[in-house]
Curated annotation (Swiss-Prot):
Mn(2+) 2 binds at residues 156, 158, 244, 246. One of its GO terms (biological process) is L-histidine catabolic process to glutamate and formate. Mn(2+) 1 binds at residues 130, 156, 160, 244. It comes from Geobacillus thermodenitrificans (strain NG80-2). Pathway: Amino-acid degradation; L-histidine degradation into L-glutamate; L-glutamate from N-formimidoyl-L-glutamate (hydrolase route): step 1/1. Pfam families: Arginase. Coiled coil: none annotated. Catalyzes the conversion of N-formimidoyl-L-glutamate to L-glutamate and formamide. GO terms for molecular function: agmatinase activity; formimidoylglutamase activity; manganese ion binding. The keyword Metal-binding applies. The keyword Hydrolase applies. Keywords: Histidine metabolism, Hydrolase, Manganese, Metal-binding. Binds 2 manganese ions per subunit. This is Formimidoylglutamase.
Length: 322
């Protein structure tokens, strides 16, 4: 079910009403109702929420991620505006999963994302459980057509390649995608040995998944990771980034479905996000698995908002054309 955007969630401190250098995001955000016609836009990105944690429930995780789109948007509203002149940021509303209808909601999310991309708008999808990524994929594939080579980069502690014999969950979507679409490549950054069974590592090898373990992603090895990202992107026509917040150490991101005692530092994750999003082939981003109900002092929500803003600041398509 589609819910149009509401101005009421975009409020915050006002340091000036005339000096744009003092503006915050809530003073620059625009509302974009997807239930009406869309006109082509340039230098534009849009947040769209996926109010859903049905996949988390089916995966026996801690529910609460459906509260994240509203919480993350509220945190984003308070952040200062540093985007280039000419950039426009929109709130495109939310797709709400009602009565457990996960598959229908993922299809609706896909249609919304396809419309944004076809109008020249870069989607920044705020989940929701990581089942969000399947709807994200559906929209990108619809916009690109069936023959484009699509690379998916997943910053995550888990492969999310579980079998889906009993239906999709928040842990099955990349297996679904790879089974359905032979034009997709899959690369995972931050995989944890203790977060995946040996069977899942074997499945990752069988599906041709590229990955870098969390313990290999250190500040001293970041250039090697960048090179792997460049090589992966070079083999695809377009790239999408999906961020699962459980890839981050629980000390910095406790409010997730499956917190980890290990994990990436926020600064290292930020470096990866900047590198991936600034690549000219990257067309969209999603961020998932924030659970405000179990967060500590709002730190996970705040970090998620910061990651979303980093994506906006480094999107190539939001920069002025030269």
């Amino acid at each position: 079910m589609y819910q149009p955007p509401e101005a009421s969630c975009w409020t915050g401190r006002v340091d000036s009403v005339s000096d744009e250098r003092a503006f915050r995001l809530h003073q620059r955000i625009r509302l974009l109702d997807l239930s009406g016609p869309l006109t082509p836009l340039e230098q534009a990105a849009a947040f769209i929420g996926f109010v859903c944690d049905e996949g988390v429930r089916r995966n026996q995780g801690r529910q609460g991620a459906k509260e994240a789109p509203a919480a993350v948007k509220a945190a984003l509203a308070r952040l200062p505006w540093h985007l280039p002149s000419g950039a426009s940021i929109y709130d495109a509303g939310d797709i709400v999963c009602a009565d457990g209808r996960l598959e229908q909601s993922q299809a609706e999310l896909g249609k919304a994302i396809a419309r944004l991309l076809q109008s020249g708008v870069a989607p920044v999808v705020i989940g929701g459980g990581h089942e969000t990524a399947y709807g994200h994929y559906l929209g990108v594939r619809a916009a690109l057509g069936p023959n484009a080579r699509l690379g998916i980069i997943n910053i995550d502690a888990h492969f999310d390649l579980r079998p889906y014999d009993n239906g999709p969950t928040s842990g099955t979507m990349f297996r679904q995608i790879l089974d359905e679409d032979k034009q997709v490549g899959y690369c995972c950054l931050g995989i944890q040995r203790l977060g995946n069974t040996a069977a899942l590592f074997a499945d990752a090898e069988r599906y041709g998944c590229e990955y870098i373990l969390e313990e290999q992603l250190t500040a001293g090895a970041i250039e090697a990771a960048y090179e792997r990202i460049e090589q992966f992107a070079s083999r695809h026509d377009s790239v999408i980034l999906t961020i699962c917040m459980d890839a981050i150490s629980a000390a910095a991101a406790p409010g997730v479905s499956a917190p980890s005692p290990f994990g990436l530092s926020p600064s290292l994750a930020r470096a990866l996000i900047r590198r991936i999003v600034s690549h000219p082939k990257t067309i969209s981003v999603d961020l998932c698995e924030v659970n405000p109900l179990v967060d500590e002092g709002g730190k996970t929500v705040a970090l998620a908002a910061a990651f979303c803003m980093e994506a906006l600041l480094h999107f190539r398509r939001l920069q002025p054309r030269r």
